[in-house]
Amino acid sequence: MAKLTKETFIASLKEMNIQEVMELVQAMKDEFGIDPSAVAVAAGPAAEVSEEKTSFNVILKSDGGAKIAVIKAIKEALGLSIMDAKKMVESTPVAIKENLKADEAEELRKSIAASGAEVVVE
């Protein structure tokens, strides 16, 4: 008997209908003693690809019409000069502070948003 190549097997499989494929699978289970539930258990749960975000950026989207109050809030929160805070507010959207922990980012967002600014944490 000639050796069956992978390509020949796949080509033959493509020509089969669903019933024939199911019969082939059952025959393989019987011949090789494969238990499908054992294969699923051996594979285990799929590894989670998503990582939990640990670094956050606080972004000033707009001054919300309260430019002076927002400038003061940024000056106090970041320890900037009044001119640096003004430049930051005038160049929205701008990252106020980057690479913060979640609680620090939320605290900063709340303190600046209290002045009327539109601030988001990303």
UniProtKB/Swiss-Prot annotation:
It comes from the Bacteria. The keyword NAD does not apply. One of its GO terms (biological process) is translation. It holds the Pfam family Ribosomal_L12_N. InterPro entries: Ribosomal_bL12, Ribosomal_bL12_C, Ribosomal_bL12_C/ClpS-like, Ribosomal_bL12_oligo, Ribosomal_bL12_oligo_N_sf. One of its GO terms (cellular component) is cytosolic large ribosomal subunit. One of its GO terms (molecular function) is structural constituent of ribosome. Keywords: Ribonucleoprotein, Ribosomal protein. Forms part of the ribosomal stalk which helps the ribosome interact with GTP-bound translation factors. Is thus essential for accurate translation. HAMAP family: Ribosomal_bL12 (MF_00368). Homodimer. Part of the ribosomal stalk of the 50S ribosomal subunit. Forms a multimeric L10(L12)X complex, where L10 forms an elongated spine to which 2 to 4 L12 dimers bind in a sequential fashion. Binds GTP-bound translation factors. PANTHER family: 39S RIBOSOMAL PROTEIN L12, LARGE RIBOSOMAL SUBUNIT PROTEIN BL12M. Belongs to the bacterial ribosomal protein bL12 family. This is Large ribosomal subunit protein bL12. It comes from Mycoplasmopsis pulmonis (strain UAB CTIP).
